[in-house]
Curated annotation (Swiss-Prot):
GO terms for cellular component: mitochondrial outer membrane. One of its GO terms (biological process) is ergosterol biosynthetic process. Its EC number is 1.6.2.2. It comes from Aspergillus terreus (strain NIH 2624 / FGSC A1156). It catalyses: 2 Fe(III)-[cytochrome b5] + NADH = 2 Fe(II)-[cytochrome b5] + NAD(+) + H(+). Keywords: FAD, Flavoprotein, Membrane, Mitochondrion, Mitochondrion outer membrane, NAD, Oxidoreductase, Transmembrane, Transmembrane helix. One of its GO terms (molecular function) is cytochrome-b5 reductase activity, acting on NAD(P)H. This is NADH-cytochrome b5 reductase 2. The gene is mcr1.
Amino acid sequence: MFARQTFRYAQPLKQSFRKYSTEAPKGKSLAPVYLTVGLAGLGVGLYRYNSATAEAPAERAKVFTGGDQGWVDLKLSEIEVLNHNTKRFRFEFEDKEAVSGLNVASALLTKFKPEGGKAVLRPYTPVSDESQPGFLDLVVKVYPNGPMSEHLHSMNVDQRLEFKGPLPKYPWEANKHQHICLIAGGTGITPMYQLARHIFKNPEDKTKVTLVYGNVSEQDILLKKELEELENTYPQRFKAFYVLDNPPKEWTGGKGYISKELLKTVLPEPKEENIKIFVCGPPGLYKAISGNKVSPKDQGELTGILKELGYSQEQVFKF
């Protein structure tokens, strides 16, 4: 069990005001005194009002509002090559002060229509912070015969893509679970990172997080810098285990595929209360670990390694 981290909060300073009484000269009107006191009181009132107004941040406009909003067209402003088959794409908002409107955990639906063909739709989870104004970032791996990933990787800066959302996945609440486990493969890390970052960003949330992340090679590990930063900042609450199918000679992490033995070692036991296991990755990972989803709204039967280890359907969520 990880030790819980204690947070201390600074108490806001309270301002105190002294009251002064002044005796008016005899035989003269008290009106100037009342006027002075009244104006002083008004000044204090305005100061307090303006201070409170300044301290309360204005709610930012949301780009995606769901419902019948329809598609939102965004311009691609930056492209960053992460490795041989993965890029980070930054799409900017028309309103540079607006935020995406996504919550945790949720995704966006993307759409493009090839010339003479049918529209292609694919969901993606942004890796940028939900409170980040002005833009959103997608991390996308290109797959052979993957029409949306191939389209994204062929895009140039200033081209545009249609988005719709948010698509709610799992309604997270602070301290909803005592311990969560994230089992990911490849770009399946994106919703896991969204969730982990949100947990550690909230000082009220004391949830412990274990990540098991499988990839082919070391260069395929996405968001490694961000994950290491979380682990270094919250060593008592966040543990990451990396597994490589084709590791270098000096690799000290897991080798091969995410195995039953590894999960039995690093995950909390099924009998522990208030735990949740999240799974996201390619079809082969779902098949081996938890079984595939039937549809976005149907989690399907729990099978695979997690079933063999004794976890229940209610303890597992498939992104």
